[in-house]
């Protein structure tokens, strides 16, 4: 999930902030695509509470074509559990990819 530091909604974005958001979306999608078991990245915006902007990045598992379209957020309830070690490895791949263009990887607490 990507969220703003300030409490704003998409309608509050300036053109400059919108341009930065677009660049960040592309960076995250490219980073997630480095994971060899991700077929596609879906980007969604939900939230009906005022001034809370969140984008959700959802990875469709490679080869799971039945997970097309808007139903992807519901599939997590029926998919088999994802391997915990693989999940951590993918998180590291994404973090390292994002850090290549500035920033640093922050290790999660155990």
Predicted regions and their residues:
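HIT superfamily nucleotide-processing domains
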Residues: 1-110
